[in-house]
């Protein structure tokens, strides 16, 4: 049924008169699941977890990623918010969306646009309040839509109370909640590890004259997951949100939770990256086996709450990906598969190869073709001439393969990547550091285009990022 219906969907996408964009996802869902049954009286559709065939709800679901800054602005301050998302639930329901993944909406200094969390159990005022969040979950449930939160597990903000205490003294209560080390010698960091966002992964703190480790920005110090107190505190965060009605978490950068305690230097590869740093193999600070111990325990908490765990594993190696399912599928239900992101053109041979590899995986696939860190599929797969047709073909393929798709907002209407034309317009720190070779991620984070009114219906004032001139 799945493969046969894929052809029907693809043909429909190639004939625009046959199918409107508002039914794109809903129609494609039919290829991989039975016709949905109406919920029993008094029972919200989102409460059902297993179907008659024993499939979990997330195996039939279409997930939809929302970057809250850019989705819908309810109070006209130029930044999207939770009330904006709530106002668009009818639209999401009509699309056939079963769950929305909301990127971080917690209090944050916004150095990395929310991926530097200063309080895991609240909502950043720019997005609203806990009351607004509760309203969103309540209204979403009425529409049969589940809420998935982005959980930044690897690090906190340097403004989090844990880190502020940790850096205050070598004997502080939270000192060992982060990774502190002496330098190799005065003025030199403990090893050669580099930050993903440029420069050394070690920053010297003048107060205690020790270095702290950060895989990402200096304002994002890594948590020490070898400390049981850290694990307990972070597990409690998930329980807090489960009680508020969420159905699971997307675990950010889950592969970087552990580092080699002996701090061996990483192997250095030839050349420089786009930020001008040596290219290194993250042998000693990524994908260490200890992460699987944490995932097994976190899965138990998820199972107790009927929750789903999606993992950002950043691997295109099927053998490595399989490890994140765990033995007997006791770790992540949905480790994110980035194989399609390695294909940058519509090549049947390349896609056939990747699909065959995905089908060899030990668990249920979770495909990624676009998100807030990746150039939109419209541009990546397009040839500059037939982009509209290619986008429709990709949608048909993506939504009818065995597995769970995650649609990035705006993909359903063919939104394009629009990077800034000038360095002074760049908001993403990566783009400011790496310009012009690396222009950052602003281009794939522009406001959702709702209609043909001013600012494409996103806001009545100038948005935090400009609406592309190609919007229509």
Where are these regions (language model features)?
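Positively charged n-region of N-terminal signal peptides that target proteins for export
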Residues: 1-4, 304
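Boundary at the C-terminal end of the N-terminal hydrophobic targeting segment
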Residues: 22-28
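Acidic/aromatic-lined carbohydrate-recognition and catalytic surfaces
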Residues: 29-239, 243, 256-316, 327, ...
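Hydrophobic residues within beta-strands of alpha/beta enzymes
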Residues: 100, 249-251
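Core domains of carbohydrate- and sulfate-ester-processing enzymes
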Residues: 164-209, 343-360, 431-469
């Amino acid at each position: 049924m799945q493969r046969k219906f894929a052809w029907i969907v693809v043909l429909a996408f190639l004939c625009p008169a046959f199918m409107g964009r508002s039914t794109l996802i809903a129609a494609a869902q039919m290829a991989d699941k039975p016709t949905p049954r109406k919920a029993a009286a008094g029972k919200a559709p989102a409460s059902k977890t297993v179907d008659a065939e024993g499939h979990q709800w997330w195996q039939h679901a279409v997930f939809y990623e929302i970057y809250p800054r850019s989705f819908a602005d309810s109070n006209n301050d130029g930044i999207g918010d939770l009330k904006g998302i709530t106002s668009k639930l009818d639209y999401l329901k009509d699309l056939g969306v079963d769950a929305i993944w909301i990127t971080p909406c917690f209090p944050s200094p916004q150095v990395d646009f929310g991926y530097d969390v200063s309080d895991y159990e609240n909502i950043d005022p720019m997005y609203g309040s806990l009351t607004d969040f509760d309203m969103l979950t309540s209204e979403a449930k009425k529409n049969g839509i589940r809420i998935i939160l982005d959980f930044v597990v690897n690090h906190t903000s340097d403004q989090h109370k844990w880190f502020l205490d940790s850096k205050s003294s070598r004997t502080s209560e939270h000192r060992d909640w982060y990774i502190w080390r002496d330098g190799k010698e005065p003025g030199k960091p403990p090893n050669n590890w580099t930050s993903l966002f440029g420069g050394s992964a070690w920053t010297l703190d003048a107060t205690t004259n020790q270095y702290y480790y950060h895989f990402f920005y200096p304002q994002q110090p890594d948590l020490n997951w070898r400390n049981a107190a850290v694990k307990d505190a972070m597990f409690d965060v998930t329980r807090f949100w489960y009680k508020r009605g969420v159905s699971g978490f997307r675990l950010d950068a889950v592969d970087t939770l552990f580092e080699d305690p002996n701090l061996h230097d990483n192997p250095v590869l030839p050349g420089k990256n786009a930020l001008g740093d040596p290219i290194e193999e993250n042998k000693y600070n990524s994908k260490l086996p200890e992460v699987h111990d944490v995932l097994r325990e976190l899965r138990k908490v998820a199972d107790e709450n009927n929750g789903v765990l999606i993992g950002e594993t950043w691997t295109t190696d099927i053998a490595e990906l399989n490890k994140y399912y765990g033995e007997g599928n006791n770790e992540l239900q949905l480790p994110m598969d980035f194989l399609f992101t390695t294909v940058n053109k519509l090549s049947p041979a390349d896609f056939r190869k990747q699909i065959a590899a995905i089908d060899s995986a030990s668990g249920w696939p979770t495909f990624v073709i676009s998100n807030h860190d990746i150039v939109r599929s419209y541009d990546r797969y397009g040839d500059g001439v037939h982009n509209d047709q290619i986008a429709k073909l990709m949608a048909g393929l993506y939504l009818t393969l065995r597995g769970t798709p995650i649609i990035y907002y705006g993909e359903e209407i063919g939104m394009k990547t629009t990077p800034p034309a000038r360095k002074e317009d760049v908001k993403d720190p990566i783009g400011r550091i790496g310009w012009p070779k690396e222009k950052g991620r602003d281009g794939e984070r522009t406001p959702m285009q709702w209609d043909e009114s001013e600012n494409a219906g996103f806001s009545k004032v100038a948005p935090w990022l400009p609406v592309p001139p190609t919007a229509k």
